[in-house]
UniProtKB/Swiss-Prot annotation:
Belongs to the RNase T family. Binds two Mg(2+) per subunit. The active form of the enzyme binds two Mg(2+) ions in its active site. The first Mg(2+) forms only one salt bridge with the protein. This is Ribonuclease T. PANTHER family: DNA POLYMERASE III SUBUNIT EPSILON, RIBONUCLEASE T. Disulfide bonds: none annotated. Mg(2+) 1 binds at residue 23. The record marks 29, 77, 124, 146 as: Important for substrate binding and specificity.
Length: 223
């Protein structure tokens, strides 16, 4: 069985996965046709006692790709004006290239094998990240192609809430609804929420697992 220091490391906690919190703001629901307008990422780290906490934050306003659909209802919902020059928007390639570079370094520094997206209703964010990476021909995508950690599902289990604002408030995390639907704000709050869910499970005695070494070896042999 791994010693305590390994179980307190990020690589030991999530089976070699490096969790990165992602939130995207978009001009619709179709990842293939609708514009990615904003993306933020928060990397995570463990302290020496195995408590999860936010680490580095990245944030980009993104230029719509050529031919992208801009759904008026989506723009009204998130309040983004894609034509506003004050956004300081960058290309999809530049935004994802920088995020991927930081994530790959984190994977290496933390001794992990691959990154995994953490997001609220994660299928949505994962699909837009994957579609943008494909459009930009970014072949070294560090994120798992389909697995995610979904804080909506985890919050439903732990807190009885699935809406981000309600889950945060129930968990004792402040949430300013006037800042919601900003990728930067939502990512930061989702990161705090995920850390609280993971740390709460630890405080309740759910981690580390009380398994014998032989049981872990048997499971590893089956993988």
């Amino acid at each position: 069985m791994a010693d305590k220091s390994d179980l307190n490391a990020l690589s030991g906690r999530f089976r070699g996965f490096y969790p990165v919190v992602i939130d995207v703001e978009t001009a619709g629901f179709n990842a293939k046709t609708d514009a990615l307008l904003e993306v933020a990422a928060v990397t995570l780290k463990m302290d020496q006692d195995g408590w999860l906490q936010p680490d580095e934050t990245l944030h980009f306003h993104v230029e719509p790709f050529e031919g992208a659909i801009l759904e008026p209802a989506a723009l009204a919902f998130n309040g983004i004006d894609p034509t506003n020059p004050l956004r300081g928007a960058v290309s999809e390639y530049d935004a994802l290239h920088e995020i991927f570079k930081v994530v790959r370094k984190g994977i290496k520094d933390r001794g992990c094998n691959r990154a995994i997206i953490v997001a609220h209703n994660a299928t949505f964010d994962h699909s837009f990240m994957a579609a943008a990476a494909e459009r930009c021909s970014l072949k070294r995508n560090p994120f798992h192609p389909f697995a995610t950690f979904d804080t909506a599902a985890l919050s439903g289990l732990v807190l009885g809430q699935t809406v981000l604002a309600k889950a945060c408030i129930t968990a004792g995390i402040a949430f300013d609804s006037s800042q919601a639907h900003s990728a930067l704000y939502d990512t930061n709050q989702t990161a705090l929420l995920f850390c609280e869910l993971v740390n709460r499970w630890k405080r309740l005695g759910g981690w580390p697992l009380a398994l014998e070494e032989s049981s872990l070896e048997d499971t590893s042999a089956e993988d």
